[in-house]
C-alpha cells in the first residue's frame, strides 16, 4: 500500500497557530506545551521512550489520537490504516506504520493532534 506523505507545513509557530484555529485550543497553551515538551523542536526524541516530535507523543497515544480525530483534519487516509488489535493496542500493518508514526515529526500534524 502506498501512502502519500503530507508536505512540510512551514514554520512551527505558524503550524501551532493553524492548529489553534482549527481545534479551538488556546494558541498560548499549545506554544507553552510545545516549549515544555520539545523546546519547539519538531524532531525531538525522548531517550527512554517512544515519545517523539513537537509534543512528544508516544506511539499508542499518537495512533489513538490520529484514529479518533485524524479524518476531521485531513488525515483520514492515515486514520483508516489504524486499527485496534485483540489486545486493545493500536496497530498499523507493514511499512505504513512508520509513515503514520512519522507524522509526529510534522509540525502541523503534531500541533493539530495536540489540539485534540
Question: What name fits each language-model region?
Answer:
Residues 1-40, 104-116:
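Export/targeting segments at the very N-terminus of extracytoplasmic proteins
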Residues 42-54:
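Peptidoglycan cell-wall recognition and remodeling modules
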Residues 38-45, 64:
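Secretory-pathway/luminal and periplasmic proteins that interact with or process carbohydrate-rich
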